A protein has these predicted regions:
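Membrane-embedded alpha-helical bundles of multi-pass enzymes
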Residues: 1-204, 240
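Soluble catalytic domains of enzymes that build or remodel membrane lipids, polysaccharides, and related
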Residues: 202-372
Length: 372
């Protein structure tokens, strides 16, 4: 529950620092039991994972129902299967931590952050990866600790956030003869967190994040209901909404406007009429725009792409999404999961981009992150 609550929405970020504590304590107590321990360590992690992911990714059932055209029962079944699969990784964490505790005693709890990061990396890599709901994301709105990500990345940030949970487990789990070691290790965990937060706070206050030339950027969110997005009856209204908001932002003197992923209600390079209408309106606004749109190349390549258009209406660069969403944008191991074609028909034919691309905007170069 703490893991789910710490994530963006409801974003109770402080809970992230202690969210693994209850699981670590439960696993430590289980590891102290005489063998055989049975399936208890695995089940502890599995239940933790089920609650965690049910609270964070159950909304995918709506995506399957709206875009996949599935009935509610089947959509919930598939979302449940996804949640069950993701829950296996906290279960693996519990098994690995139990093994470490059996060999090294309670002080081995100091390894909990490393083991957790290992299972996150595994989850983000296997079967093309599912890198959502990483523990480090709980601090996405907390600037001081977030600075550590510039040095150690998201997985390192997850490990940092897990350290206080390890410290709590070290302090509350009894182990005769090893009290001094437990206290020293817990203090070391908290000291690492303290150093990272102090350094991050100093970095934020120093203005290092604002060093160099700056630009004013407007983010345009059309808030288009998903049921209307690809409905031809709403195409004109959607385009009007985005271009109107862009013109409004331009009047406020911004240097760049950014639209969301797949924001155009048409395929950019296949619908010349709407592309020209959009181009003319953006030229009138007089500001560069980064926008998301589908792109078709040849008879079989279909990309989720981002484009940058300069103030004169010329496309100056594009980026094709490289890490696609399984079952949303493509079907992994299609030869084995051929039966899934009908579940995601029309939404799984995207091709993966092959290279990283920086988009030029004036003297700046932009890196575009597309969902997932």
């Amino acid at each position: 529950v703490l893991l789910a609550l710490s994530m963006p929405t409801p974003a109770l970020a402080p809970l992230g620092w202690v969210a693994l504590g209850p699981l670590c304590v439960a696993v430590a107590r289980t590891a102290r039991r005489p063998a055989p321990r049975g399936p208890r360590p695995f089940l502890l992690g599995l239940v933790t994972g089920l609650v965690m992911f049910a609270g964070t990714v159950s909304w995918t059932s709506d995506v399957l129902a709206i875009f996949g055209g599935l009935n509610a029962a089947l959509a919930w079944l598939l979302a449940g299967l996804l949640i069950g699969y993701l829950a296996v990784y906290p279960a693996l964490f519990s098994l690995a931590l139990t093994a470490a505790l059996v060999r090294g005693g309670t002080p081995a709890l100091v390894l909990a952050p490393d083991i957790w990061v290992g299972t996150e990396w595994l989850r983000g890599t296997l079967f093309t990866g599912f890198p959502w709901v990483l523990l480090g994301y709980s601090q996405s709105d907390t600037l001081a600790p977030l600075q550590a990500a510039s040095v150690v990345g998201i997985y390192g940030l997850s490990g940092l956030v897990a350290l206080p949970s390890a410290a709590i487990a070290l302090l509350v789990t009894p182990d005769r003869g090893r009290q001094r070691a437990r206290v020293v290790l817990a203090a070391a965990c908290l000291a690492v967190v303290g150093v990272a937060v102090v350094w991050g706070s100093a970095r934020v206050r120093s203005g290092a994040l604002l060093a160099g030339p700056t630009s004013r950027v407007a983010l345009v969110q059309g808030n288009v209901p998903q049921g209307q997005k690809w409905d031809p009856a709403h195409r004109d209204a959607i385009l009007e909404r985005y271009t109107h908001l862009t013109a409004e932002a331009a009047r406020r003197g911004v240097d760049l406007v950014v639209w969301p992923e797949s924001s155009t209600p048409f395929v950019w390079n296949r619908d010349a009429e709407y592309a020209e209408i959009m181009r003319a309106r953006l030229v009138s606004a007089g500001v560069p725009v980064v926008f998301g749109s589908d792109e078709v190349v040849g008879p079989s390549e279909f990309y989720n792409a981002a484009f940058v258009m300069d103030a004169q209406g010329e496309i100056r660069g594009s980026y094709r999404k490289m890490h696609l969403v399984p079952f949303g944008e493509y079907i992994p191991v299609r030869w084995l999961l051929f039966f899934a074609d009908s579940l995601v028909e029309g939404f799984s034919d995207f091709s993966a981009g092959q290279r990283l691309t920086l988009l030029p905007v004036g003297s700046h170069r932009l890196s575009v992150a597309v969902c997932y």
